[in-house]
Amino acid sequence: MFKFNDEKGQLKCSFCGKTQEQVRKLVAGPGVYICDECIELCTEIVQEELGSEEEVEFKDVPKPKEIRDILDEYVIGQDEAKKALSVAVYNHYKRINSNSKIDDVELAKSNILMIGPTGSGKTLLAQTLARILNVPFAIADATSLTEAGYVGEDVENILLKLIQAADYDIERAEKGIIYIDEIDKIARKSENPSITRDVSGEGVQQALLKILEGTIASVPPQGGRKHPHQEFIQIDTTNILFICGGAFDGLEPIIKRRLGKKVIGFSSDAQAEVEEKDLLSKVLPEDLLKFGLIPEFVGRLPVITSLQPLDEDALVDILVKPKNALVKQYEKMLELDDVELEFEEEALREIAKRAIERKTGARGLRSIIEGIMLDVMFELPSREDVQKCIITAETVRGEKAPLLILHDGTIIEYERKTSA
């Protein structure tokens, strides 16, 4: 180990041994000194390490099949949508890694439009993709956006959410994913341009065009318009992947008319239902134009994929199969109180039926289970005599209380204790 000073009493760098006269700067710490040259060397080593991590993060992009396989672990069904998303995401990051040009051929950006009913898995798919790729991710609601100059959020606020998700690391944010939900709500109210100002419709589509395509945007770090004198953050949106999603209620009749079918036909109910279910998969850009999206906006979303409404079987699978399945989560929570939880098959089907009746899809499953489990989860942590709790179909319908199996083998119905 180097001494802190030599025979002449000159201070030395504790790492390289150079004296204070041989270097430009010597920084003192508790019982240790480091020179500017060693600081520079350490900085280079750290930057090299961070650079290689960044390289792995964006260059080792999983292949489309690998992406689809990971999506399968978290999202049930929607195979066509998963395939389309896997290919689009893979191509997007391949394009980034090739610097957008191969042999003077410029590769276009693959922004994605997902069309599907509420609770069909649009947001979950986008979130899971960002987790697979380990990139910053932000969700924005199109209904809160308005044109500049009107009350509401500017489109730049979407970019601020992504920058915040990347901990203000602009380089990372520039390779992130933004999911814009309820995109159908900014459609023009009429197919023909109106003289009346459409503050939250066509104007917002126009405002989104540049950031979807790729531009250097100026983002207010504090958001909104309340701080006009703040310095702006510059961010290049060229390599940000935008995924837009919406239910697009009213799109099916437009597709039917294009296919030459009457909106109200004479086919059997079963056949009509099958056709209705498959209609969204036949969507074309021209249908979206008739719905109220402007041509330039549709052109910025080249990948269009549709999600099917989830049927009873799919909802039951969602409850039990994914890695983060709701039933597994509730089982784990009760397990922490030394109680085993069991949902009977018919109970799961009853929960699925309720979600379909409410038209909430997978999104409504948690609130249904929460309502069933609330009293049980309030009471059981205070009881030490319960070994197992069984949720039956009658429990879900509200006809009977959950069954409790005590440690001595006795089976009783749960009785809600009311406070005096």
Curated annotation (Swiss-Prot):
GO terms for cellular component: HslUV protease complex. SMART domains: AAA, ClpB_D2-small, zf-C4_ClpX. GO terms for molecular function: ATP binding; ATP hydrolysis activity; ATP-dependent protein folding chaperone; protein dimerization activity; unfolded protein binding; zinc ion binding. SUPFAM superfamilies: Glucocorticoid receptor-like (DNA-binding domain), P-loop containing nucleoside triphosphate hydrolases. One of its GO terms (biological process) is cell division. Zn(2+) binds at residues 13, 16, 35, 38. Component of the ClpX-ClpP complex. Forms a hexameric ring that, in the presence of ATP, binds to fourteen ClpP subunits assembled into a disk-like structure with a central cavity, resembling the structure of eukaryotic proteasomes. ATP-dependent specificity component of the Clp protease. It directs the protease to specific substrates. Can perform chaperone functions in the absence of ClpP. This is ATP-dependent Clp protease ATP-binding subunit ClpX. It comes from Anoxybacillus flavithermus (strain DSM 21510 / WK1). The gene is clpX.
